Amino acid sequence: MQYHDQFDVIVVGGGHAGTEAATAAARMGMKTLLLTHNIETLGHMSCNPAIGGIGKGHLVKEVDAMGGIMAQAIDHAGIQFRILNSSKGPAVRATRAQADRLLYKQTIRHTLENYPNLQLFQQACDDLILEGDRVCGVVTQAGIRILSKTVVLTAGTFLNGLIHIGMEHYRGGRSGDPASVTLAERMREMPLRVGRLKTGTPPRIDARSVDFSQLQMQLGDDPVPVFSYLGKPEQHPRQVPCFITHTNVQTHDVIRANLDRSPMYAGVIEGIGPRYCPSIEDKIMRFADKDAHQIFIEPEGLTTHELYPNGISTSLPFDVQVQIVRSMKGFANAHIARPGYAIEYDFFDPRDLKPNMENKCLQNLFFAGQINGTTGYEEAAAQGMLAGINAALRAQDKDPWAPRRDQAYIGVLMDDLSTLGTKEPYRMFTSRAEYRLLLREDNADLRLTPVGRELGLVNDERWAFFNHKLEMMAQEQQRLQDTWIQPQHPATEGLNKILKTPLSRPASLEDLLRRPEVNYQDLMAIEGVGPGIEHPQASEQIEIQVKYAGYIDRQQDEIDKQLRHEETLLPLDLDYSEVPGLSKEVCIKLNDTKPQTIGQASRISGVTPAAISILLVHLKKRGLLRKSA
């Protein structure tokens, strides 16, 4: 049965990757179809009810800078906002928000249902339509064939999903949703490298059964931050506290006594779990010297009693889960509303992807999200947007786009995945970015909004807002440079109160702001100096640019040197075993990965600088030295 319409882009899956992929393609004017097995679960938070965090918040800001929907959704659904690492340098500061799970899902669905160029269709995808090595559509569970110029696959944990609670297991994409078995088996017949990963989630607790007087309260920040560059605090719903408790010796004894009933330790689960979000069983075994682990008690929403105990993800049997929960302070009489579980699922080796997220073997097919071996809503959203952008470009026969490592965390993410691959669920951290001083949360718009506008992702409202901010910053930066304070100036008395050493010679406001003990707000509060600009994001960027100018310039110099050969293209049909001088090990790794650029090749483990020099000489001799567009 043929569907009555054809599309430029079909997105399979309505999670965090799928929704960003679909909206990105639609913003670029593409006729887009979002295919989901259940419209009711669009934007559903399968695990923790939160957005952001170290490295993750940076990704959300980058998606927002290019017009994505995640940041604006959490601004309308966030019930607690905090800036993490607020006392540290600007490179590692990150926004994190607790979400009302239901409100977030409702916001995403409302956004999608009212998005121009985007249609929703509730059908599971069972197959891809192929013409040779080219994908040209999908086949649904009901046998409906839908044609499209490109397909973006964002199936999350649904491909051959297997849920484990103790020794019991059953098929599922997540709790309450069916696994995608037919599509998974069909994908295994294609020329794709497939592996298994696992992730898990903790039991949910009924708040009415918890003694909060025994817990430590954790409040959000005041003033309340926003996530989107267009966000306003008044968009936030009512703010609520989180709480903290700890595991203890009794908890750990219960877990150790029941490890033989853990599917992970009994060898039932084959997939590798996330290193940086381990199960409570893993924590107890890996950190055997610790008598306690901190557990964050997070509300699931304003209209539910469910709590999310962040830190006790487990696949132990239900009776053991009850013992674990009730051993913690404040939880002696706790009622578990939903048991925790682990889920195994298929993923595809991301080294089989080009940097633009298109599969190397199958044209017009793009992968995004957990099927690429990542973990986390934010990593999925970033990949989804990039895949949606490039599916739209491919549908228009335009050149692909992928950010470099020095341009965006999205670039770091995709370069790591497509070059190095992953054997465990990949999570973003600021430590993964060598140029993190330039890739801050505060300047994601400066880095990516102009690119987004050029690609057709940024609408007039966002573009006008961005340019107004640039104007304000330019005018204020000029004022700071041109305004000088003399030692005898009336403002000096107030100024000396915040300076470590009194002002003894003329200084510009920019010079004063460069001092570590002076911040922009304090400087503007001095009579005769202010009022300055009230836009908090603009003033923050001005202060960072002034204080860190030397470090930023030095890092930019490093980037300029690195870029000399970073984008030199490598022929995809190059047989590295025929390049004289390369070791057998290097040849195997290069032939296995097929890097697209010298930059990618240089980041493959075992490929030495000497090997890169040999490659460059080989390319030059054969007249193959050329840069990517």
Curated annotation (Swiss-Prot):
Cofactor(s) listed: FAD
InterPro entries: FAD/NAD-bd_sf (IPR036188), GIDA_C_N (IPR049312), MnmG (IPR004416), MnmG-rel (IPR002218), MnmG-rel_CS (IPR020595), MnmG_C (IPR026904), MnmG_C_subdom (IPR047001), MnmG_C_subdom_sf (IPR044920)
GO MF annotation list: flavin adenine dinucleotide binding
Localisation per UniProt entry: Cytoplasm
Keywords: Cytoplasm, FAD, Flavoprotein, NAD, tRNA processing
Domain of life of the source: Bacteria
Signal peptide: none
Coiled coil: none
GO biological process: tRNA methylation; tRNA wobble uridine modification
Keyword Flavoprotein: yes
Chief location: cytoplasm
Chain sites annotated for binding NAD(+): 273-287
GO cellular component terms, A-Z: cytosol
Pfam family name, one: GIDA_C_1st
List of residues binding FAD: 13-18
PANTHER family (alphabetical): GLUCOSE INHIBITED DIVISION PROTEIN A, PROTEIN MTO1 HOMOLOG, MITOCHONDRIAL
Assembly and interaction partners: Homodimer. Heterotetramer of two MnmE and two MnmG subunits.
Recorded family membership: Belongs to the MnmG family.
Function according to Swiss-Prot or TrEMBL: NAD-binding protein involved in the addition of a carboxymethylaminomethyl (cmnm) group at the wobble position (U34) of certain tRNAs, forming tRNA-cmnm(5)s(2)U34.
Protein name: tRNA uridine 5-carboxymethylaminomethyl modification enzyme MnmG
Organism: Tolumonas auensis (strain DSM 9187 / NBRC 110442 / TA 4)
